[in-house]
Amino acid sequence: MVPCTLLLLLAAALAPTQTRAGPHSLRYFVTAVSRPGLGEPRYMEVGYVDDTEFVRFDSDAENPRYEPRARWMEQEGPEYWERETQKAKGNEQSFRVDLRTLLGYYNQSKGGSHTIQVISGCEVGSDGRLLRGYQQYAYDGCDYIALNEDLKTWTAADMAALITKHKWEQAGEAERLRAYLEGTCVEWLRRYLKNGNATLLRTDSPKAHVTHHSRPEDKVTLRCWALGFYPADITLTWQLNGEELIQDMELVETRPAGDGTFQKWASVVVPLGKEQYYTCHVYHQGLPEPLTLRWEPPPSTVSNMATVAVLVVLGAAIVTGAVVAFVMKMRRRNTGGKGGDYALAPGSQTSDLSLPDCKVMVHDPHSLA
């Protein structure tokens, strides 16, 4: 077991449309935190179906009870909430004892704050059958003990956890837990998926874009954003000329957006002027095909000014050309040139028709009267 991995799992989890077949998961995250001098330990249970929080219990609430966190859970009757509340309160008492027990296992004083965390749940495939079950414990942010994939044996992270392992082996704890994971857990997951299908079975595709950030020494950071997607599983990669940049890429954990969707970004540092050689690739089940993005530089102010100047010059040239053409036409007509329809009026002189007079006539339509 790798130390301190469970804490990262907990942090990542807490943190319309197409439909999808699976897999799906039912998970419970449990946290008990001692706080010497401030009363009893705080105890919390948070339930997730896939990436959606649907129930919560908090011992610090004004009236600690199991509460719905998704609208579709309002279908459950009062007996459900009473039963789950009593179970949570029983678990709360057990974890208070566990916190005191672990102080002895690790030879720790009673003056400090300590934390027990648990992740427990099951995952089913598109056919509704169990793919895997799990139950893992952490103490003060590091792995303590975990049920193995065979659902029959345990792995202890240190000597203190070996004490717990021996006790659970003698009590047949793995057999009891396996029955829950293969039976009760799967049954409730199917029920929740049915009740919340409009929300849980949806797929929201990511909205992606690339931003540009200046750095010293002729470097820039390109950051690829994926926003508003569900479910949370997504992959972002950067490539240079078709080759993935794994070691040079900075990647943040997928984060809840607060509206039931998720967000994530990945960045890479590149030489200034070489941005167009780098591409971001986004993979998500809500996309018909992966997205490929480059940084698109906005039109510069200089470029805009040049464009305006060109348009002004062209416009002036067109107007001038039209005026000149009109003047020449009028001159041909007044001098009896080929194609002229007008004869000179008696006493008129061709030298009296000048360009300035024509300009006035062109720009002042009322002079035609």
Swiss-Prot record:
Keyword Phosphoprotein, does the record have it? Answer: yes
Q: Where is this region: Alpha-2?
A: 112-203
- GO CC terms for this protein? external side of plasma membrane; lumenal side of endoplasmic reticulum membrane; MHC class I protein complex; phagocytic vesicle membrane
Query: Where are the glycosylation sites?
Result: 107, 197
Instruction: Give the main location.
Output: membrane
Name the segments for region: Alpha-3: 204-295
Transmembrane segments in this chain: where?
Answer: 306-328
The answer to whether keyword Phosphoprotein applies is yes
Q: How does it sit in the membrane?
A: Single-pass type I membrane protein
Q: Where do the record's region annotations for Connecting peptide lie?
A: 296-305
Query: Looking at the record's lineage, which domain of life comes first?
Result: Eukaryota
The record's InterPro entries line, in alphabetical order, gives: Ig-like_dom, Ig-like_dom_sf, Ig-like_fold, Ig/MHC_CS, Ig_C1-set, MHC_class-I_related, MHC_I-like_Ag-recog, MHC_I-like_Ag-recog_sf
Q: Where in the cell is it found?
A: Membrane
Secretion signal, residue range per the UniProt entry: 1-21
Q: Which residues form the Ig-like C1-type domain?
A: 206-294
Q: Which cysteine-cysteine pairs are annotated as disulfide bonds in the entry?
A: 122-185, 224-280
Provide the GO biological process annotations. antigen processing and presentation of endogenous peptide antigen via MHC class I via ER pathway, TAP-dependent; antigen processing and presentation of exogenous peptide antigen via MHC class I; defense response to bacterium; inner ear development; negative regulation of neuron projection development; positive regulation of T cell mediated cytotoxicity; T cell mediated cytotoxicity
Q: Which UniProt keywords apply?
A: Disulfide bond, Glycoprotein, Immunity, Membrane, MHC I, Phosphoprotein, Signal, Transmembrane, Transmembrane helix
Query: In this UniProt entry, which residues form the Extracellular topological domain(s)?
Result: 22-305
What Pfam families does the annotation carry?
C1-set, MHC_I, MHC_I_C
Q: Which family does it belong to?
A: Belongs to the MHC class I family.
Protein function: Involved in the presentation of foreign antigens to the immune system.
Quaternary assembly: Heterodimer of an alpha chain and a beta chain (beta-2-microglobulin).
Protein name per UniProt: H-2 class I histocompatibility antigen, K-B alpha chain
Q: Please give the organism.
A: Mus musculus
The encoding gene: H2-K1
